[in-house]
């Protein structure tokens, strides 16, 4: 009998809380598909460091389970409160508390089981889309595979129902202590509103807003110099300020009403302000939590887009040659070249020397002008629009460790070698006027070089060479063809200099096997001890032998392992937050039925009342979303600016945040429309 009653109630519950049920289905589907990445045997064989994605997805799953458990316990508490009179009726009919507990447990688990099974079925198809995206991101091909993954299913089952059981156990004590009088009063608790001190509440809200401004200002001006402890403290204070905002926001509305602002009696504003103020006061902690979830969702998706653009554009820029090998000055690279030619007769290989004349003029200029060296005594304001240039005739004082980023002397390359490499990469040849030299540098550094870079002359062949042009094409400049930069001069001028090191660059058509890659590594035994690193921070490989196929695969794998969990967390957090908003609004349809009847008695037509309900729902939905959009938008604008400067990608804040916001709005509108249609239908139900 109790089982039959539980199943009947479960069938009714999923209809009454359809948005909650659909969200559980979506979370189960998303979780099942992402868990497939953890346990798929083919993925584990793609990379030797496949554990990276397992670790990142494990961390993402942990944070998702926290929010999922919060959602389920919130909804269980919410349903217990809304059905308190029903439980009181059961007690009046002579049921024991233990029996009521079994009924509620049974229907809750039945609802979860239905959502889980349906989500698993949908997850089988969602898994194909996810795997196709994943393989595309790492540069592999994927064929549809609907095979059943038992470990993935068991992992999802364990995570999903662990959250359910924890949420039910959390409320077990309430069932034991319930009584008829308490249950009858329970569904009226939200109506007991304490206004408290309005001035204190308003000041609390304004303090939260003030910290938002402080947070953005500090992040903009000091973001690059903050250490980890400072960042953690700022984030903790930001979360606290979000809760402070909602803790006193209702007081601001109340003060506005007491002062009888000009817009109070315009249309239905009085009704709307009172409803929103009441809702904020009873849900201020929930609103704060929802704002945090919305903020994390937008930030996570925006950061994932940044990483995705970086891996798609900058990795190939860093490693344009199929193979780059660095050797000592005396190295001939005969063994390496013979190995490459043996592996691929169509390979185009060029061996050349890099020289130096003992000068440090351009190196000094970089050290005194790049932002990367500002904290060591450089002056980044000497760039475009900055103040007077620092002297390029003497080195600034630097810690010993900083020299490893650049060679001790300016590296030079012959013009013939430079053009040979440009032809290999498909670039047009560079011209050079007599008495001049070229600067080959990274694109991201160009904006940090001032116009005074053209004043930097370098001694060579008994004369001073002037800067005739700057090139920023992809050129493998993390220590091989210079570190961040290399100078190019006429062959007869450069050949008078001292040989610095030997370099081999090769373009190999097709794909190399693991055995071929191993053979190339084994062929190089004359290891160099003079390699520099440059100033890149996102991806940096300091080694004599660079094989682009391997480095691109590792880079794409690593960044995809970070970006996909961010999207995973963002989608789940967004759905959870919108579910809370929708269920809260739909549950009030009974109360609003009376309000609508009152408005109708005052002369408002049904169309006007529906418009008022639309405004009320819009305000209710926007209340936790607007602060999240402002905070995340401000953070993304600042972070993306620093990201573009640090990596050289051509994106902007609009590219990252705009795309995330577009996806956010799309999902938001689906939930909002579904909630509005259901709300209006329930309000006018006879």
Predicted features, each with a name:
Residues 15-22, 33-63, 79-81, 89, ...:
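Peri-transmembrane interface segments
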Residues 72-82, 174, 251-265, 575-602, ...:
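Juxtamembrane interface at the cytosolic side of transmembrane helices
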Residues 14-20, 104-122, 157, 195-205, ...:
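Selective transmembrane-helix segments that form parts of the transport pathway or gating/packing helices
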Residues 28-40, 74-78, 110-140, 152-177, ...:
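Small-residue-rich transmembrane alpha-helices
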Residues 29-59, 133, 231-232, 241, ...:
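Alpha-helical transmembrane segments
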Residues 1-28, 192-207, 247-297, 591:
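N-terminal Sec/SRP start-transfer signal
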Residues 315-560:
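Nucleotide-cofactor and metal-assisted catalytic machinery
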């Amino acid at each position: 009998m109790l089982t039959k009653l539980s199943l009947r109630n479960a069938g009714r519950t999923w209809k009454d809380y359809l948005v909650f049920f659909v969200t559980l289905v979506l979370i189960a589907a998303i979780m099942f598909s992402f868990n497939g990445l953890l346990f798929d045997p083919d993925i584990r064989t793609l990379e030797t460091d496949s554990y990276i994605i397992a670790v990142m997805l494990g961390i993402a799953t942990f944070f998702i389970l926290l929010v999922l458990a919060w959602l389920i316990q919130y909804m269980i508490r919410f349903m217990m409160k809304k059905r308190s009179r029903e439980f009181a009726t059961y007690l009046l009919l002579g049921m024991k508390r233990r029996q009521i507990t079994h009924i509620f447990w049974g229907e809750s688990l039945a609802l979860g089981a239905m959502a889980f099974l349906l989500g698993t079925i949908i997850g089988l198809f969602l898994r194909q889309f996810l795997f196709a995206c994943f393989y595309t991101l790492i540069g592999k091909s994927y064929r549809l595979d609907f095979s059943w993954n038992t470990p993935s299913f068991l992992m999802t089952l364990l995570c999903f129902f662990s959250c359910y059981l924890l949420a039910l156990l959390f409320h077990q004590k309430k069932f034991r202590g319930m009584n008829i009088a308490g249950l009858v009063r329970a569904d009226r608790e939200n109506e007991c509103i304490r206004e408290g001190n309005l001035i204190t509440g308003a000041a609390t809200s304004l303090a939260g807003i003030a910290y938002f401004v402080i947070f953005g200002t500090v992040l903009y001006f000091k973001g690059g110099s903050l250490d980890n402890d400072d960042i953690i403290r700022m984030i903790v204070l930001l979360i606290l300020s979000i809760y402070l905002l909602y803790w006193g926001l209702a007081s601001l509305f109340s003060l506005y009403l007491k002062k009888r602002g000009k817009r109070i009696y315009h249309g239905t504003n009085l009704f709307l302000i009172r409803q929103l103020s009441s809702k904020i006061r009873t849900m201020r902690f929930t609103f704060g939590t929802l704002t945090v979830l919305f903020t994390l969702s937008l930030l996570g998706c925006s950061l994932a887009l940044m990483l995705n653009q970086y891996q798609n554009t900058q990795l190939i820029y860093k490693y344009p040659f199929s193979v780059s090998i660095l050797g000592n000055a005396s190295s001939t690279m005969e063994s390496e070249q013979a190995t490459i030619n043996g592996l691929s007769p169509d390979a185009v290989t060029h061996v050349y020397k890099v020289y130096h004349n003992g000068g440090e003029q351009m190196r000094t200029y970089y050290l005194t002008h790049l932002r990367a060296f500002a904290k060591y005594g450089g002056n980044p304001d000497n760039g475009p629009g900055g103040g007077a240039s620092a002297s390029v005739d003497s080195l600034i004082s630097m810690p010993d460790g900083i020299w490893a980023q650049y060679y001790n002397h300016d590296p030079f390359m012959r013009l013939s070698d430079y053009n040979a490499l440009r032809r290999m990469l498909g670039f047009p040849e560079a011209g050079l006027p007599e008495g001049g030299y070229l600067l080959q540098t990274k694109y991201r550094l160009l904006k940090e070089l001032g116009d005074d870079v053209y004043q930097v002359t370098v001694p060579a062949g008994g004369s001073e060479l002037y800067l005739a042009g700057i090139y920023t094409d992809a050129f493998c400049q993390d220590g091989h063809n210079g570190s961040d930069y290399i100078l190019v001069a006429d062959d007869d001028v450069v050949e008078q200099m001292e040989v610095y090191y030997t370099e081999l660059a090769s373009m190999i058509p097709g794909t190399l096997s693991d055995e071929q890659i191993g053979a190339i590594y084994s062929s190089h035994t004359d290891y160099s001890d003079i390699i520099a690193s440059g100033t890149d921070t996102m991806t940096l490989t300091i080694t004599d032998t660079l094989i682009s196929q391997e480095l691109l695969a590792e880079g794409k794998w690593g960044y995809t392992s970070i970006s996909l969990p961010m999207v995973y967390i963002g989608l789940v957090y967004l759905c959870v937050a919108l579910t809370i908003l929708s269920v809260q609004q739909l549950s009030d349809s009974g109360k609003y039925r009376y309000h609508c009847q009152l408005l109708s008695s005052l002369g408002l037509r049904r169309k006007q009342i529906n418009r008022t309900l639309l405004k009320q729902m819009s305000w209710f939905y926007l209340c936790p979303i607007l602060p999240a959009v402002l905070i995340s938008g401000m953070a993304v604008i600042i972070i993306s600016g620093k990201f573009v400067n640090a990596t050289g990608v051509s994106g902007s804040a609009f590219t990252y945040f705009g795309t995330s916001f577009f996806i956010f709005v799309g999902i938001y509108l689906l939930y909002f429309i579904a909630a509005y249609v259901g709300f209006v239908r329930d309000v006018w139900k006879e």
